[in-house]
Each structure stands twice: as structure tokens, then as C-alpha cells.
């Protein structure tokens, strides 16, 4: 009888490098609002809360370079650098704040 649990993943020993080989952009972000803003790992950063001040054009088609299912919290008045990586696949985005609703490459 096996000791494996259904759906269990057993990774190899050592470090796992996220987004290996992807272009990484570093962007300075400031929260100009009076409330914290939290952005998840796969949120289209271009469409993040308007209280976050950053060069939005640089972030079109990008998401945070953090592990899936995690997030970064921006406290009011804070400024921090974040690393972003491009979306892959079809590069089509719908929803979020409805600023794109289509191709990320136009």
C-alpha cells in the first residue's frame, strides 16, 4: 500500500526559482490613499487601485513576481519597489477594472 496522498505533490530538494527566464521589471509604487491596498499574485498590475501611484504604461500586461496565491499589501503613504513579470499564454485579459478587456499586446 502506498503512503501517497491523492493529489500530493512531492517537489525535489533545493530551491525553486519562480518565473525563471522571464523579463522582470522593477517599478516604484506609492499608496496615495488613506487605506491599505492589497494586490494578488496574478492581478493585472496595470489595473490596480487608482490610489496606487506608478508608471502604469510600464505595467501593461504585467503581474507581480511573487508565488501564486500570495499578495503584497501597500500601506497608506508607503512607497516600495515591486518586481513584475509578463503574463504568458494568449495574453488576453477581461475583468479586473475593465481597463483592457482584450489583448494585452495592443
Curated annotation (Swiss-Prot):
Subcellular location: Cytoplasm
Alphabetized InterPro entries for the sequence: Urease_beta-like, Urease_betasu_sf, Urease_subunit
Pathway: Nitrogen metabolism; urea degradation; CO(2) and NH(3) from urea (urease route): step 1/1
GO MF terms, alphabetically ordered: urease activity
Pfam families named among the record's database cross-references: Urease_beta (PF00699)
Lineage: superkingdom: Bacteria
Its EC number(s): 3.5.1.5
PANTHER family recorded: UREASE (PTHR33569:SF1)
Protein name according to UniProt: Urease subunit beta
Amino acid at each position: 500500500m502506498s503512503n501517497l496522498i491523492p493529489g500530493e505533490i512531492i517537489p525535489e530538494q533545493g530551491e525553486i526559482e519562480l518565473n525563471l527566464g522571464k523579463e522582470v521589471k522593477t517599478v516604484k509604487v506609492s499608496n496615495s490613499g488613506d487605506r491599505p491596498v492589497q494586490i494578488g499574485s496574478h492581478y493585472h498590475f496595470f489595473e490596480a487601485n487608482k490610489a496606487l501611484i506608478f508608471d502604469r504604461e510600464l505595467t501593461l500586461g504585467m503581474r507581480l513576481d511573487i508565488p501564486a496565491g500570495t499578495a503584497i499589501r501597500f500601506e497608506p503613504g508607503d512607497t516600495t519597489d515591486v518586481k513584475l513579470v509578463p503574463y504568458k499564454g494568449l495574453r488576453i485579459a477581461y475583468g479586473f477594472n475593465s481597463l483592457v478587456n482584450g489583448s494585452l499586446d495592443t
